């Protein structure tokens, strides 16, 4: 019980220092935590509760170290022991989020604080404050994100960024079993994890009607206006890059890439000129993992695509204030620039309309099949830059990645999708984030690459080692066997125990470059260059 008291009081002290609650909230906060964990004690330390000295509200970087996850773990375990939480990872997480939600300001207070900063024309200050709050409240899972493995790999396209995503929690076997027995509740609430109705939602277990849904008591959503509609602005809990934010429609409706969507993107960068914003494509295979809810993703990161070399210039007839550039990038990306927002919007819309109807069977692009299904779309990204290309200037940039989701017997998952030879590294869709040059790779690669490393080192140490047989006979390595043998043939001489994993990481980055090239509709050969020029000339 002493552990519970200490964890609760330390958590409250942390919340006070982070300006989430006030000093006079100590007793209320302590009792609220007890209620959350299904307890009626232990008694708090009254000397602590009645402290009157001013707590220094220091800059976050200078605050005393505090293990937020550790304190929440103690309290969640107490909730399990008290019968107030399921004895599962998701049950513990729901209690932790309930506690943090109770210690956070209400949405109306958060909105008032945010809009106060926006009202004095300080969007950077507004997002800094809001992002800090989301981190402090444990909604942005900083400790989990820090577990991700990251590196960059030099390629012909520039330095590609690679991440093995370890931040999202593994599914608890008990949750998986419960999900199998869950009843279908009919209409789900919230309809998906991007709906604004998630704000404050308590979550539900895998066994509940409708299945598992994460707790969102510590989620705060800022209302914003995009193209005259109400949208929500929040940060991603498992961020893939700096200040990874999400803008989502208040209406649960499908993704769509059109003039209205582009207008929303432009409105967003006018609200937050220091952020980029982009949309996943609106078709399967080339879209993201959620096509059912209209949303965008943005943040403060500069992606490799934004530093891609310029290959050639073009103009869009009728839009003399817009300059077009073909980028040296594995996907087929056209960049538009203009000081004139209206012309940029019109030019981008013209290109999207033209692309949706463009067929060039010489390179496998088919706009519509005989059944009337559309296959062409665009992954758009918008930002504002200054004369040196830094975020926040007066020049609008639109990156239009041309996409096609046609399938064939040879490539049943998609002609312009990661090909089968690379599925051992990446077989999921190439969405917005990866289009821009940041790979999000699955956690299975950690043990798999570790096992490949051991076999390569064994082969280096013993010339008689049957590398092919060892790789094929190892469940962790079988899918990587051909690739690993090729890596050893090319780089075996330089392989050491110290650099083996770095070499494998470099080679994974090279594979990611090939995967992006697979997704490009106009390849970087003579036929592809000619095909791209035909499309540009058609404008």
Where are these regions (language model features)?
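Catalytic residues for metal-mediated phosphoryl-transfer on nucleic acids/nucleotides
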Residues: 202-281, 302, 320-460, 464, ...
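Sequence termini and other peripheral, non-core segments
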Residues: 1-207, 399-402, 406-539
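Surface-exposed, flexible loop/turn segments at secondary-structure boundaries
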Residues: 285, 304
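Active-site beta-loop-alpha junctions enriched in small/polar residues
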Residues: 167, 282-284
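ATP-dependent carboxylate activation and anion-phosphoryl transfer catalytic cores
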Residues: 306-311, 316-317, 441
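Short glycine-biased active-site loop of nucleotidyltransferases that positions the nucleotide triphosphate
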Residues: 154, 286-291
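Histidine-centered catalytic micro-motifs
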Residues: 290-303
């Amino acid at each position: 019980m002493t552990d519970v008291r200490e964890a609760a009081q330390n958590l409250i002290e942390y919340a006070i220092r982070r300006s989430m609650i006030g000093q006079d909230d100590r007793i209320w906060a302590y009792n609220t935590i007890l209620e959350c964990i299904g307890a009626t004690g232990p008694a708090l330390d009254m000397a602590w509760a009645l402290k009157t000295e001013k707590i220094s509200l220091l800059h976050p970087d200078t605050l005393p170290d505090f293990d937020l996850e550790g304190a929440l773990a103690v309290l969640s375990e107490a909730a399990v022991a008290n019968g107030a939480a399921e004895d599962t990872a998701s049950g513990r997480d729901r209690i932790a989020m309930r506690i943090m939600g109770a210690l956070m300001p209400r949405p109306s207070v958060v909105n008032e604080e945010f809009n106060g900063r926006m009202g004095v024309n300080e969007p950077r200050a507004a997002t800094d404050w809001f992002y800090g709050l989301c981190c402090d409240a444990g909604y942005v899972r900083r400790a989990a994100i820090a577990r991700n493995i990251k590196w960059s790999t030099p390629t012909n396209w520039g330095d590609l960024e690679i991440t093995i995503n370890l931040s999202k929690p593994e599914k608890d076997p008990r949750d998986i079993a419960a999900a199998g027995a869950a009843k279908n509740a009919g209409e789900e609430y919230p309809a998906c994890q991007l709906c604004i109705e998630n704000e404050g939602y308590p979550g539900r277990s895998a066994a509940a009607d409708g299945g598992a849904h994460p707790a969102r008591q510590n989620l705060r959503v800022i209302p914003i206006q995009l193209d005259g509609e109400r949208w929500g602005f929040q940060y991603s809990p498992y961020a893939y890059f700096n200040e990874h934010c999400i803008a989502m429609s208040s209406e649960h409706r499908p993704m769509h890439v059109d003039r209205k969507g582009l207008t929303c993107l432009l409105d967003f960068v006018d609200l937050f000129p220091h952020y980029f914003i982009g949309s996943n494509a609106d078709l399967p295979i080339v879209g993201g993992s959620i096509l059912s809810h209209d949303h965008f993703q943005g943040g403060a990161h500069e992606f490799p695509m934004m530093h891609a070399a310029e290959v050639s210039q073009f103009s869009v007839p009728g839009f003399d204030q817009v300059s077009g550039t073909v980028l040296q990038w594995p996907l087929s990306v056209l960049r538009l620039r203009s000081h004139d927002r209206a012309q940029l919007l019109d030019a981008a819309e013209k290109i999207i309309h033209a692309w949706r109807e463009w067929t060039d069977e010489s390179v496998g692009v088919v706009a519509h099949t005989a059944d009337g299904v559309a296959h062409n779309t665009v992954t758009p990204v918008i930002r504002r830059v200054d004369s040196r290309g830094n975020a926040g200037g007066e020049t609008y940039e639109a990156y239009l990645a041309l996409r096609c989701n046609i399938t064939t017997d040879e490539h049943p998952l998609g002609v312009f999708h990661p090909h089968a030879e690379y599925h051992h590294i990446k077989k999921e869709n190439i969405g917005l984030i990866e289009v821009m040059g940041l790979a999000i790779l699955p956690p299975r690669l950690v043990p798999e690459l570790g096992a490949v490393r051991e076999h390569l080192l064994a082969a280096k140490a013993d010339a008689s080692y049957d590398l092919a047989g060892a790789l094929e006979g190892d469940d962790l390595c079988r899918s990587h066997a051909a690739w690993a043998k090729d890596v050893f043939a090319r780089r075996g001489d330089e392989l050491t125990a110290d650099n083996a994993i770095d070499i494998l990481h470099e080679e994974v980055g090279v594979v990611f470059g090939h995967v992006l090239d697979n997704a490009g509709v106009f390849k970087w050969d003579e036929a592809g260059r000619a095909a791209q020029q035909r499309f540009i000339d058609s404008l």
